[in-house]
Regions:
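Intrinsically disordered, low-complexity regulatory segments
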Residues: 33, 54-58, 447
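Alpha-helical bundle segments that constitute or directly flank the non-heme di-iron/ferroxidase center
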Residues: 440-452
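Short, recurring structural edge motifs at helix starts
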Residues: 63-68
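Hydrophobic faces of stable alpha-helices that mediate helix-helix packing
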Residues: 451-455, 632
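Terminal regions of secretory-pathway proteins
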Residues: 3, 9-41, 45-48, 52, ...
Length: 785
């Protein structure tokens, strides 16, 4: 196994002696009659005995009140309540628009002049790039900066949208200067002016024509909302919970005197090994996959599609005349304990691509989301027709794959991609629905798993329905896979992060039976900037430095560790089936790190490190810097937006944040209003039943409510021509990530019912082949036409 560490001594091995308690596993369920708590001696049971996976939303409660039972089908069961109805619960944030009248009318000549200046600005960038390209100003391949640029790669459509957005923003800046608008109101006052009435009218996105009776999603998510067909579409702007705080009101980053450097803020984050003994690393992996499904904010590239270099190869600043206008490098202090030893004072960072405003008005900048906003499995299938078609086999509804040794199936390989690390083992890149498929091995494993399952189901459906052609097999299988991704997210993943109480408040709990009727075309399913840039990056705290490789189901044959910092953008190790299956076992037993302000070195100091460098980038500093690039207001403003009283002093944060983090930030920030949202996310006390804090959970719950109630194709919705039948929906509700892993692994035969939680008496080891891990009944998809 290439690059896998040698087997460590006994003292370094994780203690997993409890996971195979054979007496317990021989009698996985204690037997006897099911027993569930009742409301009283003569009253019916409060809870129902169900197969364990149907009680996933209440797993945290079951850990402390282990109400197990034997389900009616003889499988391991648990006692939990039914959910019969749910209500829509989005748009909780107060109206915060600062749309104000302009101080005077703008003349046609002034408008023309502003547009001319904007176009000249783009031409100046083009001239700079021509000169820079002749001087080879681009990150060298196999550097951390190059890998980071590949992660934030802008597609051709994304680049085109970005340059259109840039012209609109530069014209807005010129108009704001002409009108002498204060930064607080500049981005709002200009929204009275329409781009369509200028020479920039071509940047406005047209509305697609929709077929309201279509049975399947479009490739780019257009027409999901018939009333607003561009909502949620790929290459659209992110939504905002609160207006941005740009320094100039238009696009200048959130930077002003008194704000601490992000390097200094990042240094309050430490690498302390503090595992969460209840949650597995699957929580982090799944969250990353979902993040890549609903959002991809690219960074600007040159007009000829080259990555932009902002620092020298050894981490120094470029001279001003050689620095690209779209660079926004991170300043690293000379006394930085880690980077100082290498003389690094500059980290590459390029500004995020901005999109033309949806309303085609002038005003402040909104960043581009290159992926579809809906939770539609686009991470597997792609967010554009071009990508989706490139991944298909066009036979039997299957996806393209690579087959090694006759039976080992992995993702297709693109020999033309150059963004994977090249060393003695690597160089070959996988391709998938999302550009970041090769980012790290745990994520790539999930990509392989889902493509395997798609092809397995497509083959089975072709036997059940011999008359179905390739297109129907592909679309029906994709529809099933998308439903499974949604169900696992809402039934298993979100309860482990948000807890059942908050999910109930936001109408996020899956129903026990029947349909939901909460689809609302007025709900904008767009991903919010705050979710993408800060709140959903909570998972970076869960990352661990290495993966443990267990070579068989006895968990006695240990294959060593796979260190994250050694395998960024290098999927070559997954060409070995032993490693692939070992990583699946790790996802069942490996614990996540505790959610707090501690983050491992693999991402804090070695992000995207290549074999040719001694250091990588700093993910924490990058997250903070990205928030300022996007003009994200401070944490305190979101505290108020989420219904709490805004803090007047740092000590007012103590009921919400851990004291240690409050003490650190009060010496860094001059004002409590300045505290960056992301560092606030890391410092919060957890809400009841969840692992994240009140502001983080507020932003996340609102987002997932939007992704449910704003998605016409959401798997539980009834009353639509494309809705699943009641029997099909019930079978989908019986599914779990455990079953998905059982179906797609090669040598994993034992698993726990809920792989988001570590093995325990309420989450026992069970065989993949038994009743305890229900299968999807594909016979329910047998068609008469």
């Amino acid at each position: 196994m290439h690059g896998v560490a040698a087997k460590p001594g006994v003292s370094n091995r994780p203690d997993l002696s409890y996971v195979f308690s054979y007496p317990f596993n021989l009698y996985r369920t204690p037997g006897g009659e099911p027993w569930c708590p009742s409301a009283g001696p003569t009253k019916p049971a409060l809870f129902q005995c169900k197969p364990a996976i149907r009680c996933s939303p209440w797993f945290i409660e079951l850990l402390y009140n282990p109400w197990w039972c034997t389900a009616a089908d003889g499988s391991f069961g648990a006692c939990c309540p039914d959910v019969y109805k749910t209500t829509a619960s989005v748009a909780r944030f107060p109206e915060s628009s600062k749309l104000t009248a302009m101080p005077r009318d703008i003349t046609k000549e002034e408008m023309t002049r502003a547009v001319t200046v904007a176009r000249q600005h783009v031409e100046e960038i083009s001239a700079f790039e021509w000169h820079a390209w002749s001087n080879m100003l681009a990150p060298w391949q196999n550097s951390a900066a190059y890998s980071y640029s590949a992660t934030t790669y802008a597609s051709l459509i994304g680049q085109q949208q970005g340059w259109k957005g840039l012209q609109s923003v530069e014209a807005s800046r010129k108009l704001a200067n002409l009108l002498k608008l204060e930064p607080e109101y500049a981005g709002f006052s200009l929204q009275h002016l329409c781009v369509r009435e200028t020479a920039l009218s071509s940047i406005c996105r047209e509305q697609p024509k929709c077929n309201s009776s279509a049975l399947y999603r479009t490739y780019d998510a257009s027409c999901n909302n018939i009333d607003y067909p561009n909502w949620g579409r790929s290459n659209s702007p992110l939504e905002r919970i609160l207006p941005p705080q740009y320094a100039d009101g238009i696009w200048a980053p959130r930077e002003w005197p008194g704000l601490p450097t992000v390097d200094s803020v990042s240094r309050i984050v430490q690498d302390i090994d503090y595992p969460d003994n209840q949650l597995t690393i699957t929580v982090m992996h799944w969250g990353q996959m979902i993040a890549h499904d609903v959002t991809h904010v690219p960074t600007f590239r040159t007009l000829n599609n080259s990555a932009i270099q902002c620092c020298t190869g050894d981490g120094k600043y470029l001279s001003p005349e050689r620095t690209h206008p779209l660079c926004f490098p991170i300043d690293v202090a000379h006394d930085n304990e880690f980077y100082g030893q290498f003389g690094v004072t500059c980290h590459d960072f390029v500004r995020s691509v901005i999109a033309p405003r949806e309303d085609c008005k002038f005003g402040y900048a909104d960043q581009l989301n290159q992926n579809t906003a809906y939770l539609d499995a686009s991470v597997i299938y792609g967010s554009t027709e071009k990508v989706a078609r490139s991944l298909r086999e066009y036979a039997g509804g299957r996806m393209r794959v690579t087959i090694i040794g006759g039976d080992y199936v992995i993702l297709p390989v693109d020999p033309n991609r150059k963004d994977c690390i090249t060393d003695e083992y690597g160089g070959e890149c996988f391709v998938g629905g999302d550009q970041r498929v090769n980012q790290y091995t745990g994520l790539t494993v999930l990509h392989i798993v889902w493509v395997r399952l798609h092809n397995k189901y497509a083959n089975q459906l072709s036997l059940i329905n011999p008359s179905w052609d390739d297109e129907r097999l592909y679309q029906e299988t994709k529809k099933i896979i998308t439903a499974l991704v949604q169900h696992i997210t809402y039934n298993e993943y979100l309860p482990s992060v948000l807890g059942p109480n908050l999910m109930g408040e936001y109408g996020l709990l899956p129903l026990t039976t029947g349909y939901t009727y909460t689809y609302d075309p007025a709900v904008k399913a767009q991903v919010t900037n705050e979710f993408a840039t800060a709140a959903f990056r909570y998972g970076h705290s869960l990352i661990r430095n290495y993966n443990e490789l267990w070579l068989d189901d006895t968990y006695a044959n240990y294959g060593g560790e796979l260190y994250l910092k050694d395998w960024y953008n290098n999927p070559k190790v997954l060409f070995d089936p032993i490693v692939f299956n070992a990583l699946i076992r790790h996802s069942i037993t490996g614990t996540a790190q505790n959610f707090d302000e501690n983050v491992v070195d693999a991402v804090h100091n070695y992000l995207f490190k290549s074999p040719y460098q001694s250091w990588g980038l700093d993910l924490i500093a990058a997250n903070l810097w990205r928030g300022r690039d996007h003009g994200i207001p401070g944490y305190n403003f979101y505290l108020e937006a989420c219904g709490s009283k805004r803090a007047a002093t740092f000590d007012d944060l103590l009921p919400i944040m851990r004291p240690a983090i409050v003490e650190k930030i009060k010496y860094l920030y001059k004002s409590v209003d300045d505290v960056d949202l992301f560092i606030g996310v890391l410092g919060e006390w957890a809400i009841k039943g969840g692992i994240v804090g009140p502001v983080t959970s507020c932003i996340m719950a609102d987002q997932f409510a939007r992704l449910k109630d704003g998605d016409r194709f959401f798997y539980e919705h009834g009353g639509q021509s494309h809705s699943f039948t009641p029997a099909q929906l019930d079978s989908i509700r019986s599914m779990s990530l455990a079953r998905v892993l059982c179906e797609t692994s090669d040598t994993v035969d034992w698993i726990t019912p809920n792989v988001f939680w570590t093995p325990s008496p309420m989450n026992p080891w069970v065989p993949c082949y038994g009743k305890d891990i229900p299968r999807l009944n594909l016979n329910l998809w047998k068609s008469t036409y």
